From Swiss-Prot:
It is found in: Cytoplasm. It comes from the Archaea. A motif ('KMSKS' region) lies at residues 264-268. Binds 1 zinc ion per subunit. ATP binds at K267. GO terms for biological process: cysteinyl-tRNA aminoacylation. Zn(2+) binds at C28, C207, H232, E236. A motif ('HIGH' region) lies at residues 30-40. The lineage of its organism: Archaea, Thermoproteota, Thermoprotei, Desulfurococcales, Desulfurococcaceae. One of its GO terms (cellular component) is cytoplasm. This is Cysteine--tRNA ligase. It is an enzyme of class 6 (ligase).
Amino acid sequence: MIRVFNTLGRRKEVFNPYSPPLVGMYVCGPTVYDYTHIGHARTFTVFDAIKRYLRLRGYDVFHVQNITDIDDKIINRAREEGRDWREIVREYSRDYLEGLGSLGIQIDHHPRVTDHISDIIRFIEGLIEKGYAYVAESGSVYFEVDKYPGYGMLSGHLSKEAWRQEEDVLHEKKSPYDFALWKAAKPGEPSWESPWGRGRPGWHIECSVMSSRYLGSRIDIHGGGVDLVFPHHENERAQSESYFGHRWVRYWLHASYLTIKGEKMSKSLGNIIPLREALREWGPGPLRLWLLSSHYRSNLDYSEEALGQYRRLYERLRQAADSIGRRLERAEPKGRLGEGELETVERLKGVVRRWHEAMSDDFNMGKAMSSLWEFTTIYFREVEQTESYTLLWLSWRILTGFNSVYAFAPDIVEARRPERSLEDSLVQALVDVRSELRRRKMYDLADEIRSRLAQLGFVLHDKGEKTEWRRR
């Protein structure tokens, strides 16, 4: 049984999707007006891991994550830089998608706002027809907040003083708390034809339309950063439930902030770290492990010390993968396990059990991460020297199970599977030749083979008369 913390109600609930095993998950993606930073990456990696864990548990998850490619921020950036807004979108969309690819984040569909203008117009027309929206003299369209009685329940902002938005257009609203569904065109800004004149969508309507376009009128998980709870998700919920006439999202999940020395990243403080720089410094595997090292609802504080710790964990996991793959090639299944081996089996099973317990409890990734450390300790202390096929195969299954969720090394399942590849066979042949040269005391040639293999990324370890190797 999986339990998740639902922001709507602020309590843990048993995970029970609308139509199991199908799960529809929508995550609010970026507004592409600047480079993706590690705060964005934290949110996107968290929801990728949640999706992967649900798939591991047998759910068929369809993951939609939008790209907001028209917005005030994009228009302002284009104006500041004297560039066409579409150039801004292309540059920062590319940066975002490259960052996701490097982190192994797999999105099933990436809808863009500008590809759904007609869908947005139809949705707004429906809200007007149902009496939840009205057209102002300027041609802008607003959602009438007072018509939706549940407004404020998601965020807890039940006092109207917290709702005030868009001060510059107060004169044309029925209430200062109403928010824009469609913004009338301004000179020099991109716009599209609509029944109310030229204009462009408001921010909140975009996600309501794109999520329901691909996931239907009932969505299992709607996620994003905690900073989106109000007003963005509050407004999404209001307009969507008004349009559909029933509960829209079953579980609202929100990832907390990534901080630096306890402070939220911000341009004013000058402490933003672009994702591309973090990837260049730490590599995708260690970075991804670190991004998943705390509970997603808790802040994650950046420090080089912490990242160094997860780089070491990454290296241990890679070493374990190489070690298991090599040993499985020569290990032979045998009969009954010895008492010590049975005890190791139980310890490994305990690692998996505790990991599932943590992940099933609102995807407690911080607690679950301890199981990866524990696994490497047990493997190198108890399994590596046994040559036990059963223990090696169990270790392999555990490691690849972890990797299917954490995705710290996407190549492990394919390139490190227990079957020997041609490359592995050639390296092993050279290692065997070197061992024979050492036996004959032809150390110069043996050292030359070690040196050449090191240049190719293979590290040799001599243990008495035996030599083991791994990829660097």
